[in-house]
UniProtKB/Swiss-Prot annotation:
Name assigned to this protein: Small ribosomal subunit protein uS13
Organism placement in taxonomy: Bacteria, Bacillati, Actinomycetota, Actinomycetes, Micrococcales
Coiled-coil region(s): none
Similarity comment: family membership: Belongs to the universal ribosomal protein uS13 family.
A biological process term (GO) from this entry: translation
One Pfam family cited in the UniProt record for this chain: Ribosomal_S13
Provenance organism: Arthrobacter sp. (strain FB24)
InterPro entries attached to this UniProt entry: Rbsml_uS13_C, Ribosomal_uS13, Ribosomal_uS13-like_H2TH, Ribosomal_uS13_bac-type, Ribosomal_uS13_CS
Residue numbers spanned by region Disordered: 93-125
Length: 125
């Protein structure tokens, strides 16, 4: 397996798809990277030369924040919002959706499994 930005890239996949295994590189960035380096998107990772791998590695690490740096930056942004007490920070702290989604129903991924609350008992006859 080839390593780019500290990630093992799958050898059998097309390069455009394989680059998306790097955190911070989606289809658009993969396409931009290949256009800038002049490498075909249809090439398989196993067919790349060492020079092409070095060129890709230098371009990605030089132009984009990826993997650990990006994860740290995102975590720092969330931490800052929590510390200053913004609305978004409060939502993060409470474990609720941050971007305005409804919570009366749905939002189960963010809220976790249902916790049953005792309700009214049925009146006997």
């Amino acid at each position: 397996m080839a390593r780019l930005a500290g990630v093992d890239i799958p050898r059998e996949k097309r390069l455009e798809i394989a680059l998306t295994y790097i955190y911070g590189v989606g289809k658009t960035r993969a396409h931009e990277t290949l256009a800038a380096t002049g490498i075909s998107a249809d090439v398989r990772v196993k067919d790349l030369t060492d020079a092409q791998l070095v060129e890709l590695r230098d371009y990605i690490e030089g132009n984009y924040k990826v993997e650990g740096d990006l994860r740290r930056e995102v975590a720092a942004d969330i931490r800052r919002k929590v510390e200053i007490g913004s609305y978004e920070g409060l939502r993060h702290r409470k474990g609720l959706p941050v971007r305005g989604q409804r919570t009366k129903t749905n939002a189960r991924t963010r809220k976790g499994p249902k916790r049953t609350v005792a309700g009214k008992k049925k009146a006997g006859r």
